[in-house]
UniProtKB/Swiss-Prot annotation:
Start-end of Polar residues biased regions: 598-609, 783-796, 917-927, 1019-1030, 1198-1213
InterPro entries recorded: AF4/FMR2 (IPR007797), AF4/FMR2_CHD (IPR043640)
Phosphoserine: residues carrying this PTM: S451, S453, S829, S830, S879, S881, S1368
Chain segments carrying region Disordered: 1-21, 55-78, 124-305, 406-539, 580-609, 733-755, 783-1172, 1197-1319, 1569-1594
GO molecular function: DNA binding; transcription coregulator activity
Function: Has a role in transcriptional regulation. Acts in parallel with the Ras/MAPK and the PI3K/PKB pathways in the control of cell identity and cellular growth. Essential for regulation of the cytoskeleton and cell growth but not for cell proliferation or growth rate. Required specifically for the microtubule-based basal transport of lipid droplets. Plays a partially redundant function downstream of Raf in cell fate specification in the developing eye. Pair-rule protein that regulates embryonic cellularization, gastrulation and segmentation.
UniProt name for this protein: AF4/FMR2 family member lilli
Subcellular location: Nucleus
Main location: nucleus
Comp. bias regions, Acidic residues: 444-455
This protein's GO CC annotations: nucleus; super elongation complex
Length: 1679
């Protein structure tokens, strides 16, 4: 039978030689290799007797029918199982790994879905389509699926990999893969619809990302050609994630040889010999593989494939900085990293094969480090090990199946038939397209690996690494880790660290039997030098594009001269494939990418290291959106949402924190070139991999439990983090965030801030980082956070945190400090720790650092996250920011506080915090602070300034509102205290004190509090924005929403933004109240003594707890009541806070980046204070204290409130500040004051160097003023208490006051006085802040050059402005933001000072300032204040903008996914606008006009892309996103039309004047002359008729006609501008997108018809980032 089948196959292939040239070669190879093939076929027959015989005996007609069926199925999102089934025949031998592989692949589906939705510029094919890249590399041996034994194995490998379902259904596939033609076998593939979309890259599947991925999808029908696989990086990524078996053809069957289905047609011949050569006959592919019936369809010509691949490669490789280009790659690579482990396992035989001589040399170093974590490989040692090809590449589950095909493929290269055919075209494609694909892979891979590896880690923790990094690690757990450690020396130390992490993971995995088995297989495979790397390292090195795919890495490595770019050894070495694989991949599911890179860093690969960098970087994040994945997102690590990764990360982060610092910085200034080499590896470890792998490794305490939790955690959460990281990275790359991906962006912005910047939460619960545009920063939206709320419970986010929402905030804070992007993974873990906070806003605050992941984490880990942190995994990530918060009890927070205090810089803080939190969360966590940990955590993360309030709010939603106010305020106070040297005062945010703060920091706070109540959200948003320098404008909205929440958020914000500020304002108000309480409540002496003792013990100044302890008294119930009371009482106070809102307003107006940087500068003091968080925190339940004082505090009069207005005043002020700009500004200022006052003594040298000089002076003055202010405040509080004895108010105030014992209240009063003085001394503080901003600026360099320049200019301006104590902070903000509110600045100076001061030295001062604040705080900044926004643009910048625009447009042209394409186009448009704007200054008017016109035509074309979606119901998430893109597009069109009119306004004026003269004079002859009736009736009838028919009128001279035409043109532009604007407004209202637009307005300043092109750029970029994050989150959820 085997012989007959082979003969039939050969005959059929010969018949089809005309259509399949490569098949002839493969047939020849088959003939030569028939003896071996027969053996293989015999084996194959055992698996695939019936179906194979049917498939191979199929005629052309049958094949065509089958192709049609497959196409239809693909269109339906169902991957055809035919080839996959046959492919499974061989892999099925690997029974041990089947279950594990299935579990892993099942997770991959989710990851693929995420990639499809999340990644931009990457099209996703069905696994087959993605595999095509690998497939082209694969010999097309099986004409159909497995015509020849080797083809069967290769196609089997490709099939399983291509079928996402294979991951989910490994067992089934093994049973059915013999029956290639049975698609039902892949019913699960429906789950892979997004990834499988590209499987058949035929244009008919526009929705599927795969098709769009390559401009030249080879077959229009479902299965993409090898070329389409090559061209479709996303599809390759998907395939890799599912299992990129096609990659198994390194030498590869020519790309064309592969069937459109992804099957290799005539390649069977070469594979069999390759099998014999490479495998040495270990595994004989089943004879069924010969059967031509299944996959003999001719693959598209190689020309098409090469062209597509080259085009894609050119587009993406040329633009490493392009966030879009880079972002897609990282996720794809992560997907491949997940698959890579299997590939490496199966690649073992390949190195031995002659064709893989080069590869094997490289491969041998690689050791197939990415041993798939699938135990089945062990079970299938003979064939699986023999088949290093597709099985390993295809994916964990597909490992067995893929092995045979891949193994066969390696022999094929020796034959040189397929090797010769495919390598030539493959290499060029590889060189060009590998980069682009690699980039996409890195982003996608990060996304996939984050979610999938997280899930896999959870699932496989017992078996193997389980994560993509785990899978890669598990495969290479021993040998792989060894190889990675060996290879690491070649690579950056990051890889070595990653190796350590991997080794740790491996150790954990080794504990598991399946893990051990996999390791054995891995070792065996590693001995076979197969170059499979979990990443797409092969892709970069491998000639074949398929190899470029991570899953195809084995074949690719073989094809590319044994680079083993599979992400294992060599490939990682060359590109940053290792970094990509290690960082991206490792960041994703595991540090599989990282380990892979560590394992695969072969010298040969080191040349291609650059490609990995690009992919690697976006992966880091995620992030951001999101780091992110590392892309996922710099903002927030993708894994955090699950929480599982977070726990491991804290340990890993700790180890790699030093390098992470660098990574964080790189992310902050995420320049693809430089950062990607070092950073990518680091990011791979930390950010790129979302530090998930490190988390898994380091969270050994969590180990199986935590990883299992990760497995339980929805991949949406994990991937979401990756996606976020990726998004933030993208945004950064695009210049919005200056980060490779959204996650990166958030993480980077956060990192930039270090502990220093206070992130702001926007209305949408977006965390605003001072240096990062709000949109970019806000990778995670409120909705994503909410959607992820449930996941957090699943996520490893420590469940212990649940009891104390505050603890998550600490984590958030840590990410802040960590903000140095790589902290994206850290952020994720911190988010996981944070999940206990229930408010999306809180999560967002944390998320803002790593935006999307944090949100996921927060939501996921509400209950569990703390446990995980306690377990030590997530605690490590957020240990710095949420060390104690990571543990619900907050012990880590206390430990984290010390590190925070120690690390002045955000990055150093992040690292130290991570280390300390790791240690503290693992062993240092004192459980004293149960409720406060979260509170402190929020403050700890200046980024999560609002996190403090939101965390407490999340804890008890409305009831927590009040408590969150006091507890979060106190915790934020603690944070500030830690940041500021002291702040050991137990700071209960009193309503009065908090309110002002809320105004100041309400912007950031709002998102965090959004979870609890709208009011809280608004308040917190204001606080956060104030902290982040009004990065988010939502504060104005938030202020009105919840006055009491404003109080909470304000205190939180002030404390978070500036520990001193929050402490001082709350301490002045609260101390006054506390004093009143002392006087009024007169708590029993026992209580007073206790409080006093506690305060002394934990008061740094008192020397307790080594001066690092803090006592946080939180009364959730009290605070809840207070929140309600404040809400009722806030109407009166709003007037006082307006000044702060005005200041905030100024900030919010600032460019997102500028705002964020300003926020960073202002917030940096907060972070500075954060380091001062005491390691010892005592949390006292206010319920145990008398509550009368709280009531009194509530009722404090505005005068008593001093710096903080009464809740009513705050509400009024907040309301008055529509955008909350003033509020934001004030909080930032407050933060400055706080930091100068308290944190400095305890600040690290670096931090002190930045802030201490001014702070020291301020401290002395503050100390002096404190005594005076304390006395004054005490008197005032007494009076106020007497006045405000009303029970409700008293209770609230009492909570704050009670929490702050009389002793604490005194200290708070002192701090208030200090802060007042600080306000007076604002000049030094602002100066310090500007310097901080400048320091952070480099972090934000990733932002568009335009933004960077603006930021730098703004920072300089801020420094200059610092001279003015009051006006300077606000002015800074104004300078920083394109829309700074100068009037606000003018009016805000006092307000800002107050904000910074947190409270004037005396209540009187506060009261006096408060009234002016409303007057001073103009909701909108002056229109004339932004004229200085862009003082100059240099021509080089224009070129850069133009290049960015062109690169994005080309990427969009090739993009198949509608959403990704539209977003890429719109990004290109805004870059074109920046180019045209620059041309206005240095080019001719005509050239500028032409540029705008062309841009307008382009955007009009783009608008046609989302019209179909606009008409559909907006309930559909996709339609909602398209509607939002349409809104942004309409706004751009409107402003472009207006610009075109303005450019020609002079001409228009002249024309109008001329026409007016013409019409006024009435000259012009009547059409028929003076005699309407023609000259004479005798004229010809014709003439008469014509004359009579001529309508009466005037003859218009040609010049007048021309002028009329011009006038029509000019006025048409003007009319279009207003009409399009109105259309956008209508769409906002009808589509219910008001919140989305309001959020963007708060973050970036409202977009108006007066907005400049730079403002349009920032606004649109922020909106696109937000949308990408939103798209990625649903994907995670669905997964």
């Amino acid at each position: 039978m085997a012989q007959q089948q082979q003969q039939q196959l050969q005959q059929q292939q010969q018949h089809h030689t005309s259509s399949i040239n490569n098949n002839n070669n493969s047939i020849l190879l088959l003939q030569q290799q028939q003896p071996q093939q027969q053996q293989q076929l015999d084996q194959l027959q055992q698996y695939n007797n019936n179906l194979y015989s049917q498939n191979y005996n199929m005629e052309e007609y049958e094949r065509r029918k089958r192709r049609e069926r497959e196409k239809i199925e693909r269109q339906q999102g169902i991957q055809i199982d035919d080839r996959e089934t046959s492919l499974f025949g061989e892999p099925r031998r690997v029974t041990e790994g089947d279950a594990e592989i299935t579990a892993a692949l099942g997770e991959f589906f989710e990851a693929r879905v995420y990639i499809n939705n999340q990644t931009v510029g990457i099209s996703r094919s069905a696994p087959g389509a993605g595999n095509p890249r690998l497939q082209p590399n694969m010999p097309p041996q099986g004409k159909s699926l497995g015509h020849s034994p080797s083809s069967a194995s290769a196609s089997a490998a490709a099939g399983p990999t291509s079928a996402s379902a294979t991951t989910a259904l490994p067992g089934q596939q093994q049973q059915h893969y013999q029956q290639q033609q049975r698609p039902p076998t892949y019913v699960k593939q429906a789950d892979n619809k997004p990834p499988y979309n590209g499987r058949g890259g035929y244009p008919g599947q526009p929705m599927k990302n795969d098709i769009p991925s390559s401009s030249g999808m080879a077959p229009p029908r479902g299965p993409p050609r090898s070329s389409s696989s090559n061209s479709n990086s996303s599809s390759a990524t998907n395939n890799a994630s599912s299992g990129g078996v096609p990659a198994s053809t390194p030498l590869g069957p020519p790309l064309s040889t592969q069937m459109p289905n992804g099957r290799e047609k005539s390649f069977l011949g070469p594979p069999a010999p390759a099998l014999h050569n490479g495998t040495g006959g270990r595994f004989v592919p089943p004879a069924a593989s010969k059967r031509p019936g299944v996959g003999q369809q001719p693959p598209p010509p190689e020309k098409d494939v090469n062209k597509i691949i080259s085009d894609i490669a050119n587009i993406f490789t040329v633009q490493p900085l392009t966030l879009i280009a880079a972002t897609p790659h990282a996720p794809t690579r992560e997907n491949y990293n997940l698959l890579a482990p299997n590939k490496q396992k199966y690649a073992m035989d390949i190195p031995s094969s002659p064709p893989s001589a080069e590869p094997s040399s490289l491969m041998t170093p690689l050791f197939a480090p990415i041993a798939s974590p699938i135990a089945p490989l062990v079970t299938t040692p003979p064939q699986a090990s023999q088949l290093p090809l597709g099985g390993a590449t295809s994916g964990t589950i597909l490992a067995g199946e893929a092995l045979a095909p891949l193994h066969q493929l390696p022999p094929t290269p020796p034959k040189a038939a397929s090797g010769v055919t495919s390598p030539g075209p493959g290499k060029p494609l590889k060189t060009e397209k590998n980069h682009s694909l690699e980039k996409q892979d890195s982003c996608l891979e990060n996304d996939l690996e984050l979610s999938e590896s997280e899930d896999e880690q959870r699932k496989k923790e017992g078996r193997s690494a389980g994560n993509s990094s785990n899978s890669s690690e598990s495969d290479s757990s021993e040998s792989g880790s060894e190889s990675s450690s060996k290879n690491d020396p070649q690579h950056h130390p990051n890889h070595q660290q990653h190796h350590h992490q991997l080794q740790q993971q491996q150790q954990q995995q080794q504990q598991q039997a399946s893990m051990q088995q996999q390791q054995v297989l891995q070792q065996q495979q590693q001995h076979r030098p197969q170059p499979l790397t979990s990443n797409g390292a092969q892709n970069k090195k491998f000639r074949h594009e398929i190899i470029a795919r991570g899953s195809n890495t084995i074949t690719g490595l073989l094809s590319s001269s044994g680079f083993g770019s599979g992400g294992s050894v060599g490939p990682a070495g060359l590109n940053s494939s290792a970094a990509m694989g290690a960082g991206s991949g490792s960041g994703g599911t595991l540090s599989s990418g990282g380990s892979s890179s560590n394992k695969t860093p072969s010298p040969t690969e080191s040349n291609k290291w650059n490609l990995s960098r690009f992919f690697h970087k976006p992966a880091n994040q995620t992030n951001s959106e999101n780091v992110s994945p590392g892309n996922v997102s710099m903002k927030v690590p993708g894994i955090l949402p699950g929480g599982a990764q977070i726990i491991p990360e804290s340990i890993d982060v700790t180890t790699a924190i030093v390098k992470n610092e660098k990574i964080h910085d790189d992310h902050m200034a995420m320049e693809d070139g430089e950062e990607e080499d070092d950073d990518e590896e680091q990011q791979l470890r930390y950010g790129g991999g979302l530090s998930v792998t490190p988390v898994a490794v380091k969270k050994e305490a969590i180990d199986a439990v935590s990883e299992m939790a990760l497995g339980a955690i929805p991949k949406t959460q994990i991937k979401r983090e990756s996606a976020e990281a990726l998004l933030s990275a993208r945004l950064s790359d695009s210049g919005t965030s200056a980060s490779g991906s959204s996650s990166s962006s958030s993480s980077s912005s956060d990192s930039a801030v270090g502990g220093e910047v206070v992130p702001k939460l926007g209305l949408g619960e977006i965390l605003q980082l001072p240096g990062v545009p709000a949109a970019i920063t806000t990778v995670m939206r409120v909705q994503p956070t909410q959607s992820q709320k449930a996941p957090p419970s699943n996520s490893v986010t420590l469940t212990p945190i649940l009891p104390l929402p505050t603890s998550p905030k600490q984590r958030q804070k840590k990410p802040r400090k960590k903000k140095a992007v790589t902290s994206a993974p850290i952020l994720d873990s911190s988010d996981d720790d944070e999940p206990p906070p229930k408010h999306p806003g809180l999560d967002h605050t944390a998320v803002s650092v790593q935006t999307p992941p944090a949100a996921d984490t927060v939501k996921k880990g509400r209950g569990r996250p703390r446990k995980q942190q306690q377990s030590g995994g997530s605690g490590n990530l957020s240990s710095a920011s949420a060390g104690s918060s990571s543990q619900t009890k907050g012990p880590t927070l206390t430990a984290a506080k010390k590190p925070l205090a120690k690390t002045p810089l955000a990055m150093s803080r992040a690292r130290k915090r991570e280390h300390s939190s790791q240690s503290s969360s693992n062993g240092n966590t004192p459980t004293k602070k149960v409720a406060t940990p979260q509170l402190v955590a929020a403050p700890l993360k200046p980024t999560s300034v609002t996190a403090g309030s939101s965390s407490s709010d999340e804890d008890s939603s409305s009831s927590a509102e009040s408590s969150s106010k006091s507890s979060s305020s106190s915790s934020s106070s603690d944070d500030t205290e830690t940041q500021n040297t002291n702040c050991r005062i137990v700071k209960l945010n009193k309503t009065g004190a908090v309110q002002k703060k809320a105004l100041l920091g309400s912007g950031s706070s709002s998102p965090s509090s959004s979870g609890s109540e709208p009011e809280d959200q608004t308040t917190r948003s204001q606080v956060g924005s104030g902290q982040a320098l009004a990065q988010q404008l939502p504060p104005y909205k938030q202020l009105p929403i919840s006055q009491h929440s404003q109080h909470l958020s304000s205190s939180e914000c002030s404390s978070s933004s500036g520990g001193c500020t929050a402490v001082c304002s709350s301490s002045s108000g609260e101390e006054d109240e506390g004093r009143r309480e002392k006087e009024r409540e007169r708590k029993p002496k026992s209580d007073k003594n206790k409080i006093s003792t506690l305060t002394r013990i934990f008061n740094p100044k008192e020397g307790g707890a080594k001066k690092q302890g803090q006592v946080v008294i939180v009364d959730l119930q009290e605070e809840q009541q207070q929140g309600k009371l404040d809400a009722a009482a806030q109407p009166p106070p709003p007037q006082a806070p307006p000044a702060a809102p005005a200041a905030i307003m100024a900030k919010p107006r600032m460019t997102p980046t500028q705002q964020q940087q300003l926020g960073a500068g202002l917030a940096s003091p907060a972070r500075t204070t954060t380091p001062h968080l005491t390691s010892l925190i005592c949390k006292i339940d206010l319920s145990k204290l008398s509550r009368e004082r709280i009531m009194r505090l509530k009722k404090l009069t505005p005068a008593q409130q001093n710096g903080h207005l009464t809740p009513k005043d705050q509400a009024t002020n907040a309301v008055h500040v529509p955008n909350g700009y003033a509020g934001d500004t004030n909080p930032a200022t407050k933060v400055k004051h706080e930091h100068p006052v308290k944190p400095e003594p305890e600040l690290d040298a670096g931090y002190e160097a930045k802030f201490k000089p001014g702070n020291v002076k301020q401290e002395f003055q503050l100390k002096q003023e404190r005594d005076r202010d304390r006395e004054r405040e005490r008197e005032r509080e007494r009076e106020r208490d007497r006045e405000r004895e009303q029970p409700p108010g008293r209770r609230r105030k009492r909570s704050s006051s009670s929490s702050s014992s009389p002793y604490k209240e005194k200290k708070r009063k002192k701090e208030k006085a200090d802060q007042l003085q600080i306000g007076k001394e604002l000049l030094p503080v602002p100066v310090l802040l500007p310097s901080n901003n400048h320091e952070r600026m480099p972090n934000h360099d990733r932002l568009s050059y335009d933004k960077l320049q603006l930021l730098h200019e703004d920072a300089a301006a801020v420094i200059g402005d610092v001279s003015a104590a009051n006006g300077s902070p606000t002015k800074k903000m104004m300078v920083m933001s394109p829309l700074p509110p100068p009037p606000t600045v003018t009016v805000a100076p006092a307000t800002c000072n107050e904000a910074v001061q947190t409270t004037p030295p005396s209540a009187t001062t506060a009261s006096a300032t408060a009234p002016p604040v409303p007057a001073t705080r103009l909701i909108y900044r002056s229109y004339f204040d932004r004229d200085v926004e862009h003082p100059s643009d240099d021509p080089r910048k224009n070129n850069q903008f133009l290049q960015e625009a062109i690169s994005r447009k080309h990427a969009a042209d090739l993009e198949r996914d509608s959403f990704n394409q539209v977003t890429l186009y719109l990004e290109a448009v805004v870059y074109f606008l920046l180019t045209a704007d620059a041309m206005e200054r240095c080019s001719s008017e005509q050239a500028t006009n032409t540029m705008y016109k062309d841009t307008l035509s382009l955007i009009k074309f783009i608008s046609t892309k989302f019209r179909p979606y606009q008409q559909q119901s907006t309930t559909n998430i996709q339609h909602e996103t398209h509607n939002k893109v349409a809104i942004l597009s309409l706004r751009c069109q409107s402003l472009i039309s207006l610009k075109l009119y303005k450019l020609r306004r002079k001409d228009c004026r002249a024309v109008i004047n001329s026409l007016a003269d013409f019409f006024r004079v009435g000259r012009g002859d009547i059409a028929n002359g003076n005699t309407p009736s023609s000259i004479s009736p005798s004229n010809s009838v014709g003439s008469q008729g014509s004359g009579s028919n001529t309508p009466p009128g005037r003859i218009v001279p040609p010049d007048i006609h021309n002028m009329l035409c011009k006038e029509n043109e000019f006025l048409s532009y003007l009319n279009s501008a207003h009409e399009l604007w109105d259309q956008a407004d209508r769409l906002v209202r009808t589509g219910n997108h008001i919140d989305f637009i309001r959020e963007l307005d708060h973050e970036n300043g409202p977009l108006t018809l007066h907005s400049t092109m730079h403002e349009v750029f920032r606004y649109v970029q922020a909106g696109l980032k937000t949308l990408r994050d939103a798209v990625s989150h649903p994907t995670h959820q669905s997964q």
